Regions:
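Membrane-embedded helix-loop-helix hairpins and adjacent transmembrane boundary segments
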Residues: 1-509, 519, 527-534, 541-549
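Membrane-embedded, hydrophobic transmembrane alpha-helices
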Residues: 512-513
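A short, polar/charged loop-to-alpha-helix boundary motif
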Residues: 522
Length: 549
């Protein structure tokens, strides 16, 4: 136990040292503490966006879904999250441009600027806070489960240990400490997950043989709709729909748009995103699929611990402990960003500290960490079920307000408020089973109704004093690209290939390889798009020579 614990504590101390390094600079002002001086460049932006988005769910939830559902869950995450990066172009680049000119710090600063209503800004912030705080608890839950399974630390002690260290380095170094720890944590998550994948499959007889054995016992893990029959086409489509509109509304991702150094940095993140999601999610789902053969009788709640269970069986004490730190890195890199962003929402939008502001803001971080831990004391049944029913749906409701505010001059504050209230009412109705949507995810009818309310109220009302001057005109040359990305979305919902006997190629169904290739193609189209767009912005005609003086 002590050998394992010493490895984990060493890693935690390293994260703390990074916070100490950036302590002095982070304590200067709000822009430095919350946004790292608006200077997060290409490499750091990509890794911090990836690490922030790839939470405990990436390791524990994805491997658990692979155990319960099978490979049917891989494309909705690998391709679906990669396609979601298109929203970084749709929303992120415009927010980045406006924030440089208009001094945004929080996501809701845009709402106040565009719609001219402080009360709407507070409503928008409140929704972000309410639906993100449970997600902080998810990271604490996962850390407690992981340390309990691997080291034997009591669940609550493990959750408290990780939460405390995250709170410490965030309060010390602000966003600068977060983006640098994200660089380390994302690298660890990728490398250590790959190492775990290799070790587990080698000890299981090799990649192809292991899959053949799993297929002989659990063929439904290689099919669609999956082992439990849950991945119906409507559910599949719903997940792709959900990621696209919900993920950019996570306040910690939204605030990365504001902190980015320039548009090139954000473009690089977009191009690389499908590659990392295609690769990393394949590893974690595959580990879960193999785990079904190794531990066939786990309950849904127990299945979220399949990753550390396999490491315990197939790796030695030192190696398994080292590799599990990759999963700790995944959850810590999300928790730190959520704590910092929620603190900015509370202190900038509600509390308004005037003296010793950064010191008091650090106190809010401590309070939020404590609250997240308290929620984790009674964890929900499964990570997947919890976040799909609360956080994602609740945040997706905000998308029409943001997109409409960016691109439609008729949108107004009353439409935004009405759509948010109506949408969140539907979220509660679905969560408490007042309403149901058989065969599809609730987010589809919720977001459709929210958008209808937003459009209708915008057309029927006017709101004087709104800042329509920042609304971006739609460029005529964008429509061919709308068709291109719509086509890729259709290819990502390959309904014509469902319910067929899987053809195994190198141990995997052919349709899994199809989605690996589609992720690469998506990245290539992102690259072509940003290059063509950059070329189109270049001034035409010969440049005028400048005479030397």
């Amino acid at each position: 136990m002590w050998q394992r614990l010493s490895i984990i504590l060493t890693y935690l101390v390293i994260t703390l040292v990074i916070g100490i390094v950036f302590r002095k600079k982070a304590s200067t002002n709000k822009v430095e503490f919350f946004l790292a001086g608006r200077g997060v460049g290409r490499l750091l932006l990509f890794f911090t966006m990836a690490a922030t988005n790839f939470s405990a769910f990436t390791i524990f939830g994805m491997s658990g879904a692979g155990y319960r559902i099978g490979y049917a869950f891989y494309p909705v995450m690998g391709f679906g999250t990669g396609f979601m990066a298109l929203s970084f172009l749709l929303i992120g680049r415009r927010i980045l441009s406006l924030s440089k000119d208009r001094g945004y710090i929080t996501p809701s600063d845009f709402i106040a600027d565009r719609y001219g209503a402080s009360w709407l800004k507070k409503l928008f912030s409140l929704v972000m806070i309410v639906f993100t705080l449970p997600y902080i608890a998810i990271q604490a839950i996962a850390s407690g489960k992981s340390l309990n399974a691997l080291v034997g630390i009591p669940y609550l002690s493990g959750a408290l240990l990780i939460t405390a260290f995250v709170v410490l380095y965030v309060t010390l170094g602000g966003l600068r400490s977060i983006v640098w720890t994200d660089l380390i944590q994302a690298s660890m998550m990728i490398v250590f997950t790959l190492a775990a994948f290799i070790i587990i499959f080698r000890r299981s007889g090799g990649f192809v043989r292991a899959h053949e054995e799993v297929y002989s016992s659990f063929p439904a893990l290689f099919s669609r709709p999956g082992q439990d029959g849950s991945m119906l086409f409507g559910i599949w489509f719903g997940y792709l729909f959900l990621w696209f509109f919900a993920d950019p509304m996570f306040p910690q991702l939204f605030q990365r748009f504001i902190a980015a150094k320039d548009e090139k940095s954000l473009n690089t993140t977009v191009v690389l995103y499908p590659l990392i999601t295609t690769f990393l999610f394949f590893l974690t789902v595959s580990i879960g699929v193999l785990g079904r053969h190794t531990f066939p009788n786990l309950s849904p709640a127990e299945s979220d611990a399949i990753f550390p269970l396999l490491l315990q069986r197939y790796a030695g004490v030192f190696v398994s402990t080292l590799l599990i730190t990759g999963s700790l890195a995944a959850l810590m890199s999300t928790m730190d960003s959520q704590l910092l962003t929620l603190t900015s929402l509370i202190t900038v939008d509600f509390v308004h500290f005037k003296k010793r502001e950064v010191l008091k803001e650090k106190g809010v971080i401590v309070a939020l960490g404590a609250l997240g831990f308290l929620i984790a004391v009674k964890p929900p049944q499964t990570i997947l079920d919890f976040i799909s029913k609360t956080t994602f749906n609740g945040l997706a409701v905000l998308a029409p307000t943001v997109i409409g505010g960016l691109y439609w001059k008729r949108s107004n504050r009353y439409a935004a408020a009405a759509s948010i209230v109506a949408g969140e009412g539907l979220v509660l109705a679905f969560y408490f089973n007042v309403l149901s949507a058989p065969g599809i995810l609730p987010v589809v009818p919720i977001l459709a109704a929210t958008a209808v309310v937003f459009i209708v109220v915008s057309l029927l009302s006017t709101a004087p004093g709104e800042n329509t001057g920042i609304v971006a005109p739609v460029q005529p040359g964008i429509w061919p690209w709308v068709l291109v990305f719509s086509g890729l979305f259709i290819l990502g919902n390959d309904f014509w290939a469902w319910n067929r006997e899987p053809l195994l190629v190198i141990g995997l169904p052919l349709w899994v390889w199809y989605y690996v290739g589609l992720g690469v193609v998506l990245s290539l189209f992102y690259r072509v798009f940003v290059l063509r767009e950059a070329k189109g912005r270049e001034p035409k005609g010969p440049r005028k020579a400048v005479k030397p003086t």
